[in-house]
Regions:
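Acidic, glycine/proline-rich Ca2+-coordinating loop motifs
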Residues: 30-194
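Bacterial N-terminal signal peptides
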Residues: 19-28
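Short intrinsically disordered, low-complexity coil segments enriched in acidic
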Residues: 1-5, 191-193
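Positively charged n-region of N-terminal signal peptides that target proteins for export
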Residues: 2-3, 11-18
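Carboxylate-rich, polar loop motifs that coordinate divalent cations or form catalytic acidic clusters
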Residues: 3-9, 36, 98
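Low-complexity intrinsically disordered segments
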Residues: 7-12, 25
Length: 194
């Protein structure tokens, strides 16, 4: 009986020492400064200067448009098949922007040359998708909000493969004039098309 108590007592001491040792190792590991998990990159370094700034006016504000703060979207995809992810930002009151990834967290604004800019129409969500199955990502942009009125149709930019796009929403029957927020594409009947 005495030996059993002794082994039980020793086992508890060993277990407590083990737990305390693990906690000490954990605390020491947490205090060592082995480098930052994230490094802040400025717009001067990245080349990304997009700001979706919302400005009130007497005619257009959260009281006259209830979805004023619904936000905008970001699409991430490789538009030129170079293995680097490019960025497309939609703007509500400001214009949309397409940034080509040049590597090492440096991007180039190619909005105008690519033909995907949109001014004065409230853009919300955006989706990169290879809609015509040519191996290049196309871009679908949803429109919402008050600005633009009847001209507020969603846009489909077909990738020409040379860093330019052609707006083709009407040809594909996707020039919707609703209050679209986001679009998702999938092959519902598994026939190979979206």
């Amino acid at each position: 009986m005495g030996n059993l108590f002794f082994y039980y007592f020793i086992q508890k001491i060993i277990m407590r020492c083990f737990i305390v040792s693990l906690l000490l190792l954990f605390c020491i590991g947490c205090t060592s400064n082995s480098g930052a998990l994230f490094i802040k990159k400025t717009s001067d370094h990245t080349g990304i200067g997009f700001i979706n700034k919302l400005t009130y006016t007497e005619e257009f504000n959260p009281y006259t448009y209830r979805n004023f703060y619904n936000g905008a979207g970001v699409a991430v995809g490789d538009v030129n098949n170079d293995g680097l992810l490019d960025l497309f930002f939609t703007g509500n009151i400001v214009g949309n922007k397409l940034y080509l990834n040049q590597g090492n967290f440096k991007f180039k604004d190619i909005t105008v040359s690519a033909g995907v800019g949109c001014e004065e129409v409230w853009s919300s969500g955006s989706t990169f998708v290879d809609l015509n199955h040519d191996g290049f990502l196309d871009l679908y942009v949803c429109k919402s909000g008050k600005p633009g009125g009847a001209h507020r149709n969603n846009e489909l930019f077909i990738n020409n493969g040379d860093l330019t796009f052609t707006e083709s929403s009407k040809a594909y029957g996707l020039d919707i004039i609703g209050l679209s927020v986001q679009a998702a594409f999938f092959d519902a009947d598994r026939d190979g098309d979206l």
